[in-house]
C-alpha cells in the first residue's frame, strides 16, 4: 500500500514548471494555494467604497455621524446622480406642461368660452340685436341669391367600384390666371358631361388674362358667386357707361376722385370686358345655394363669409363679399384682420346646432350648413368641419385649388402651382 502524505505539513515551494510536476504534486500545489491564500472576494474593489460621490457631505470625520439620520438620508439622495437626472426630467416635463397650458390649452378654452357667450341669446338682447337680424337693403343690379339646379348634384350614395356619376368642382380665386386654370382642369380630369364647375369669386383682376378666365367659365356653363373684385370692376364698368367714359380715353381726362380711386389697370380691365362677359358676371349671385350634400348638410358658396344665425335673405351683400373677421358681441363683420375669424364663430354655431339635433331628427347633419368660400389668401387652404376656404394665393405664386365632391359626399382636394404675377401689378 502506498504511503500517505500529511497535506497539512506541506509548504509552498517554487516549482520550475507545472508541466514537469507529477499529477499528485500539481494537485497538492493547487490545494495549498486555495488553502493559504486570501479568499477571492477580498480582492474585489468596490468603487462606491472610495468614491467621493457616495461620501456624506456633513464634513465630519466620521461621515456625518453627528447629523440627524434624516439629514444624512436626504443628503445622500440629493447627491445621487440618478436623483439629479430624474429631477431634470421632471422639471422639463413640468415646464412643458406649463407652456402647453399657457400657449395652447388655456387660450383655446378661453376662446371657446367667448364663442359660446357670443352665441348666447342673452348676449343678443344685451347688444340690442345682432347684425343682420333686420332686413338688409338690397343692392340694385346685384343678384342676392340663386339656387343650383339639382341635376348637377352628385348621387346620395356612391356605388363601390364605379366612378362617380356626377361631380361638383369648386375652384378658389383664379384672379385672371387662365393658364393655371386650364392646368387644374387637366389635373382633375374635368369632364364637361358629368362635372359642374363652381367658382368662389374673384375670377378676374390682378392676373394676366381675366377675359380668358370668364370665357372659359362661360364655355363650360359654370356657376359662380360675386367676389369683391368682380363687384369693383362691374361697378366701375357701369359707372363708365353712365358717364360716357367707357370708350378708351386718356386717364388724364378722368377726375382723380372718380370711380372710387381705382387704378389704371382696373379701369383698363373694365373697358376690356365685353358686354357678354359683363352680363355673365352680373348674373353671378352673392350667395349660391348648392343644396343638400351627404355628410355636409346644406352647402352654400360665397366669396367672403356669412354671419351665423342670420337668414340668408338678410345677409348683407357687401359683408358677404368682403368679411374676414366678426365682432363677438354684435356680430358685425369686418373686412379687416385682427379680430375673431368669422369661420371660428360659424363652426361653433353649427357644432352647437348639430348637437341640439342629435336624437331629435334621423339625420342631424341635414340641419347644418357648410360654407365653401374664397377671399382669404393669407390663411390659404383652410378645411374645417363647416367651412372650406379655397383661396390659396395663386396670383402671388401660390397654388390654385379645386375641391371635388363626388357621389356620397366624398371630398378631395387637388392643387396646381402658379406663377407669381404679383410683381407685374
Region annotations inferred by a language model:
Residues 2-145, 317-425:
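Acidic, His/Gly-rich catalytic cores of divalent-metal-dependent hydrolytic chemistry
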Residues 114-212:
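N-terminal active-site segment of His-dependent metallophosphoesterases
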Residues 162-168, 290-300, 384:
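Beta-strand-turn-beta hairpins that frame and shape the catalytic cleft
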Residues 167-173, 299-305, 388-390:
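Active-site-proximal beta-strand elements of phosphoester/diester hydrolases
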Residues 175-179, 205-208, 231-234, 308-309, ...:
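Active-site environment of divalent metal-dependent phosphoester hydrolases
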Residues 196-201, 260-264, 339-344:
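Short, basic, glycine/proline-bearing loop/turn elements
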Residues 210-300, 304-336:
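Active-site neighborhood of divalent metal-dependent phosphoester bond hydrolases
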